[in-house]
Amino acid sequence: MEKKESERPVVKNDSVAPTMAKTEQTIDKSRRVCTLSHAMIEMLVKQLGAELSNHNLYRTFANYFSCQGLPKLEEYFILRADEEDNHHNWILWYLNYNDAEFQYPRIEAINVDIPNRAYPFEATVDREIETTESINKIVKQAIQEGDWATEAWLKGNDDEHGKLVLEQIEEESISRTMLKWQMRTLTGKLNRILS
């Protein structure tokens, strides 16, 4: 039997493997030190501070309800504060994992007058909306930069290292639910007083 030439054409690869000279010309050399851009580090550090501020605000509300003799609401706000600390830890981990050198931002004192028992719930909804908007800006920045790793981390679902976008869906939902509950409670009490 006669040997036939292969009917399948041979794929020829004319491309040249990158040389170190080409690599040196094309890479972003700043990534040798840190994979995050300066703008991304600034945004994440700002969010790190915002999470600590949220923590302190919710601890302030916990103290208020403790002094009002409402330990269940105190406990609720302590748990909310703990969540904010967890978010802070996720951001800290990500910054450290990417070798981002930074200084902690200044955290302003919580100077808030609490005029009534509904206010902490209203303020919490507003603070969580603000937090969501801030995180969304970080996602947009990551997309604009083509920083797919940071985008994936922000949108991730990892209890240990982070899931900030998903977490904000939950945070806003819980905050709105508790505000509605508080408003129904106050309306019910007012109706009983007026009847």
What positions do the PLM features span?
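Iron-associated oxidoreductase/ferritin-like identity signal
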Residues: M1-S195
